[in-house]
Amino acid sequence: MKRGVVLFSGGLDSTACLYWAKRHYDEVIMLTINYGSREESVMNKVAEFFSKELKIPLKIIRVNFLNEFSKLSGSALVEGNVPRVSASELEVIERAKETARSVWVPARNLVLISIAASLLDALGGGDIIVGFNKEEGETFPDNTKEFVERVNKALEYATMNKVRVVAPLIELDKRGIARLLKELGAKYEYSNSCYDPKGFTEDGKPIHCGRCESCVRRHRGLMEGIGEDKTVYLVTPKL
């Protein structure tokens, strides 16, 4: 039996991975990690929505030390001001790296993968499915092919059963992910990419701020990828 654990953080990338995994695995588990990020309550409700929508079991695990370490590093994902960028600034690599540093959570992806690996090792092995992609790999070193390759080498030694990381979006940018979401029939408007979401609409769609880098990337990817964006924004990003 082919088993996969999807590391689900609520955004376009992990939502695409969830729908993709549903097609490619016999058993799928959603794993959402809480560490006190400002979008945590919205992320959890989004996870619960897709768990019910796709009939996939969900595990939510709290990791308190990541919150403490994020505050030590000054990550804007847990406190402080969320970075705002324009669409044109997304192409300025130094500006993109600057915003990446401001929301960096110390070793987050490595920690999350380790938790998923422990779960899969206990269950007898399987794949950890992550939303790493080409666009974010340009500014986040732990979203790259090289990171996946090295983590998989470490997992050969760190687990008793066969556990590996699979990154189905690694060659795609947000435009490509948008096209994949459409192909998979995903209800992406119920996902959340915003660093500082403003709650939900009456029918359960997250309300995005429309100003943070993640909102701008989301809107650009959807509009340029499939020519539409059903996301609810407080302020629609300008492209």
UniProtKB/Swiss-Prot annotation:
- Catalytic reaction equation(s): 7-carboxy-7-deazaguanine + NH4(+) + ATP = 7-cyano-7-deazaguanine + ADP + phosphate + H2O + H(+)
Query: What SUPFAM superfamilies does the record point to?
Result: Adenine nucleotide alpha hydrolases-like
Supply one GO molecular-function term: ligase activity, forming carbon-nitrogen bonds
| Protein origin, superkingdom | Archaea
Q: Which CDD domains does the record match to this protein? A: QueC-like
> Binding positions for ATP?
F8, S9, G10, G11, L12, D13, S14, T15, A16, C17, L18
List, separated by semicolons, the cofactors it needs: Zn(2+)
Pfam families (alphabetical):
QueC (PF06508)
UniProtKB keywords: ATP-binding, Ligase, Metal-binding, Nucleotide-binding, Zinc
EC assignment: the record states: 6.3.4.20
* UniProt cofactor note: Binds 1 zinc ion per subunit.
Which pathway, per its entry?
Purine metabolism; 7-cyano-7-deazaguanine biosynthesis
Matches recorded under InterPro entries: QueC, Rossmann-like_a/b/a_fold
User: Where along the chain is Zn(2+) bound?
Assistant: C194, C209, C212, C215
Q: What does this protein do?
A: Catalyzes the ATP-dependent conversion of 7-carboxy-7-deazaguanine (CDG) to 7-cyano-7-deazaguanine (preQ(0)).
Family in the record: Belongs to the QueC family.
List the PANTHER family. Answer: 7-CYANO-7-DEAZAGUANINE SYNTHASE
What is the recorded name of this protein?
Answer: 7-cyano-7-deazaguanine synthase
